[in-house]
Amino acid sequence: IINLIGYIDNNTFKNFTIEKMHQSLKINSILPWIIIRMSMQHMRNKKWGKIINTSSIGVDYGGGINSFNYSISKYVNEFIPIEIKKHFKFNIFYNVLKIGITETKIHNKIYNKSLKKRIKLVPMKKIAKPIDIANYIDFLISDLNKFINGQIIKISGGE
């Protein structure tokens, strides 16, 4: 299971509503957790499973001005419940990728001036390509990964 959902509603702390926050939580966090929960018994029976959930590097910095609901929903994904950890002994892997600024439709909508300013904050001074994230996911779900489990892993150019 790979959760790469990234719904953002451009709400600030000043203007968020319960309904909008619930929408972000439902899409980015609750629905993926339901899928994970529904899959656990099958993975346990097979004695194998790989789960990758995602968060955002913005969580470490209080999120962006227009991403209050998004940031909270991604922060929720960093929680690794004890119920998941109990399944590790059945060869089930669960990791969270905390992804930095990446060349996606969301970031391509940011004006060039704002995007350049944001990239300057990244120690590597560049934006990740989708293939950078895909390669890391490929490793984590491959047979090469035999011991990285229960981790929050940053893919953020040094942030």
Predicted regions: what they are:
Residues Y7, K14-I34, W48, I52, ...:
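Catalytic Tyr-X3-Lys loop
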Residues L4-N10, G158:
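Conserved NAD(P)H cofactor-binding loop of Rossmann-fold oxidoreductase domains
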Residues V122-I133:
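A conserved structural motif in NAD(P)-dependent oxidoreductases
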Residues Q41, I82-H87, K146:
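Alpha-helical segment proximal to the catalytic Tyr-Lys
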